[in-house]
Each structure stands twice: as C-alpha cells, then as structure tokens.
Amino acid sequence: MPYLMRLALVLFCLMALVESRKPRRKRWTGLLETSKPSHLYKKNLDVTKMRPGKPRPLLRVEDHDFTMRPAFGGPAIPVGVDVQVESLDSISEVDMDFTMTLYLRHYWRDERLAFPSSSNKSMTFDGRLVKKIWVPDVFFVHSKRSFIHDTTTDNIMLRVFPDGHVLYSMRITVTAMCNMDFSHFPLDSQTCSLELESYAYTDEDLMLYWKNGDESLKTDEKISLSQFLIQKFHTTSRLAFYSSTGWYNRLYINFTLRRHIFFFLLQTYFPATLMVMLSWVSFWIDHRAVPARVSLGIMTVLTMSTIITGVNASMPRVSYIRAVDIYLWVSFVFVFLSVLEYAAVNYLTTLQEQKERKFREKLPCMCGMLHSRTMMLDGSYSESEANSLAGYPRSHILPEEERPDNIVVHLALNSELTSSRKKGLLKGQMGLYIFQNTHAIDKYSRLIFPAFYIVFNLIYWSVFS
C-alpha cells in the first residue's frame, strides 16, 4: 500500500508539471509570432558579412601579388585617361606657371580583381583599397606643386566591375610650369600644357592613351579669368624619350589664353599717353616762365618713370624687349625731348637777350632829347640796326656810297603824330612783342611733337594688335 501511494504521488506531480508548462510555451510562441518582421521591413542580404566558418571575401586581394602590373611579362597594359577641368585658378607671369583643379580618371582591366556577379553590377570603394592593389603611376611632368583634396575625406574613388575593369578617379589641384613668351605683352597670347606620364613603366609595359580622343577632355563652361580669355582646350599625345630609361607615353592638355587688353589700356597706355600730351603744354607757356615749364617737365618725366617701374615690377625679368617696353620708352623719350626743347629755347633766348643788351649799350645818351624828332648815331652801327630802331623799310636806306658818316634816325616818339598813326604803331608793337616772346622752336614743336607721336601710335597698334 505505501508503494502505491508513492507511485500515485509521483504521477500527480508529473501531471501538474506538464500542465504548468503548456501556457508558458504558448505565451513564448505568441511572442515569437508577433515579432516576425513584415515584408515591408525585410532587409536585403548583407553580402559583406563574414559568416563564421565560411569566409567569402569580395575581392581576393590577398591571393595575388599586386606589386606587379596586370599581365606581367605580356604585352603593354592599355590605360585610358580622361580629364574634367573644374577650374583654372590662376596664371602667374612672374613665376611662369598656372594652377588648375581637375578630375583625373584612369581606365584599365585587371583580371585579378574579377568577381562573380549575377547582376553584373560594379562595386565602388574609397581610397583605402588603392593601397592594396595595383594602380597606374601617372604623374604630372613639370609640376611644381600638386595635391589630392582630402575634405571631408580623400577625394579618391575606385570602381571595380565583375569582368575586372577598373575606374580610378581622383580630384587634384596642380601647379605646373608654362613657358611664356612676352615679346608681344600685353597684346600676347599664351599656350600652356599640362603633361601626364607614367613614372616607372615605359611604353613596353604601359600604354597611356586618351580614352575618347578629343572628347576625353571636358571643361566647365563657367571657367573664366580676370586677365585672360580662354580660347581653346585640346588634347595631344606623343612619346617622350629619356636616355637612361627609354620611351614613355606622354599625354598633353593644351589650352590657349589671350590677354584682356582693356585692363592695360587703363593702367598703362592711357596714363602714358596723358603724360606725353601734358608735356606738350609747356610749348604754350611763355619761355620766360622758367619755374612753370621746368616743374612741368620734371613732373612728367618722374611720372613716366613711375609707370615704367610699376609695369616691370609685375613682370618677370626677361632679356628681350616687350611691346609695352617699346610704347613706354618711346613715350618717355617724347616727354624727355620736351624738357630738352625748353632747354634749347631758354639757351637761345639768353643769347638773344645778350645781343640786345650789347646793342642797347652802344646807343648814345638821350638825356634831354625826349621831344626831339631826330638823333645822331655813330657810323659804327650797321644799316639794319639803324633801320630797326627807326622803323623804316629797307628801301629808304641810302646807298653805301651816298651814306654820310653819321646816320640820322627819326624817332617814332613824336608828339605830332596823328592819332590814327599812333594806333597803327601800337598794333605793330603788340604783334612784334608777341612774335619776340613766342620762340620759333616752340611754334614748330606744337606741330612736330603731336604729329610724330600720332604716327608712332599708328605704326605700333598696326604691328602688335
């Protein structure tokens, strides 16, 4: 009997335990059913996730030696290039260089990077993968400075296609040398080139070419420069030879620039022309106004020197004559000649005054003879001198054999002259005064200087423009 009771008790406990577990299982099952994701929130399979025990890398980078070029030992690998110019930042005449920002893209095929894909879609990577695979070693020939942009991260993109084709793109700013010819400056045009070349691989290992010919170079239509007009962008290619290493493929990005002349017309040509014209003002100033004419000449000479110095400060020191040098120095010569012209006028005027002073010193004293109608002159005076004093024409002078020892000069200061004759004498004296104070050199200079300067400008602009 005790044995039966124990057995019944055990069975009862088991039944109670089974009944107690049934609601809990149902409750957990209900929770699992409510936590099932809807098809709207169903996520795609993450192919980058490494499953435990079954590693499946996307690119078998570790299985190959990427220090070697693709198809090493075989024919040269073709690498296509295209460029999109984002901006032409600056042109420096002093340093003879230019700065350009561009997108540089390379295209090649590396079978070691091929991967199976049912959708035939490419995979895009950032710059971290570039350090693990082979990429072309293209560099800029004659570059002074260059860098890859790194804001907010390195501006490098690598795109790999299932068949192994690779697109490698980066955003670069480069400062390169440009051989400029300033013989026609500022009426010049400059042609600059950005040159690309493989650093290590000759044409036997790497064939560098423009991927789409002339269409491989794209430019932004908004590119503009303050002093230049961009006329043309075009591409070329050729082989470059180095005596130590051999032949290399070299690609050229050529662009032609034409300088805007309006800036230099305002800053250089127009001020120089004004200074030359200002120097002509001295020809209309009385030659006895020494301070006015001297100060005007010095001012124009110093201003021309300042203009020439300012132009040379913004240009490289070249060993040949530029077009602007010809214009400025010819203008400087015109200004300097105007100063020399006044020096000649002043010198000749001084000589004339000395002769007149000596002539007046030979005249006898006229004290007490102011109302006299005539006066006696010594016979040592020439007939022209006596004639000029008396105011008679040459026809009234006696022949030499009939001339007495003393010459009688009738003075014009006679109180008995009629009023009409006095007015005529005053007009004649006024004309004689103007003629004597307007030197002949000044009169000719007023015409000669402008005429020669106009002829020079016609020749200059017809040759250089």
Swiss-Prot record:
Disulfide bonds listed in the record:
178-192
- Residues annotated as glycosylated are 120, 254
> What is the annotated localization of this protein?
Postsynaptic cell membrane; Cell membrane
The protein's topology relative to the membrane is: Multi-pass membrane protein
Which tissues is it found in, per the record? Expressed in the cerebellum.
InterPro entries given for it?
Answer: GABAA/Glycine_rcpt (IPR006028), GABAAa_rho2_rcpt (IPR008059), GABAAa_rho_rcpt (IPR008057), Neur_chan_lig-bd (IPR006202), Neur_chan_lig-bd_sf (IPR036734), Neur_channel (IPR006201), Neuro-gated_channel_TM_sf (IPR036719), Neuro_actylchol_rec (IPR038050)
Cytoplasmic face: residue ranges?
A: 282-293, 347-443
Catalytic activity line of the entry? chloride(in) = chloride(out)
Recite the UniProt keywords alphabetically.
Cell membrane, Chloride, Chloride channel, Disulfide bond, Glycoprotein, Ion channel, Ion transport, Membrane, Postsynaptic cell membrane, Signal, Synapse, Transmembrane, Transmembrane helix, Transport
* Biological processes annotated in GO: chloride transport; gamma-aminobutyric acid signaling pathway; visual perception
Q: Which residues form the signal peptide?
A: 1-20
Membrane-traversing stretches: 261-281, 294-314, 326-346, 444-464
KW Transmembrane (keyword) present: yes
What Gene3D superfamilies does the record tag this protein with?
Neurotransmitter-gated ion-channel ligand-binding domain, Neurotransmitter-gated ion-channel transmembrane domain
The Gene Ontology terms for molecular function here are: GABA-A receptor activity; GABA-gated chloride ion channel activity; protein domain specific binding; transmitter-gated monoatomic ion channel activity involved in regulation of postsynaptic membrane potential
Q: What does this protein do?
A: Rho subunit of the pentameric ligand-gated chloride channels responsible for mediating the effects of gamma-aminobutyric acid (GABA), the major inhibitory neurotransmitter in the brain. Rho-containing GABA-gated chloride channels are a subclass of GABA(A) receptors (GABAARs) entirely composed of rho subunits, where GABA molecules bind at the rho intersubunit interfaces. When activated by GABA, rho-GABAARs selectively allow the flow of chloride anions across the cell membrane down their electrochemical gradient.
- Domain comment (free text): GABAARs subunits share a common topological structure: a peptide sequence made up of a long extracellular N-terminal, four transmembrane domains, intracellular or cytoplasmic domain located between the third and the fourth transmembrane domains.
UniProt similarity note = Belongs to the ligand-gated ion channel (TC 1.A.9) family. Gamma-aminobutyric acid receptor (TC 1.A.9.5) subfamily. GABRR2 sub-subfamily.
**Its quaternary structure?**
Three rho subunits (rho-1/GBRR1, rho-2/GBRR2 and rho-3/GBRR3) coassemble either to form functional homopentamers or heteropentamers. Rho-2 is unable to form a functional homopentamer. Interacts with SQSTM1.
Quote the protein name from its UniProt record. Answer: Gamma-aminobutyric acid receptor subunit rho-2
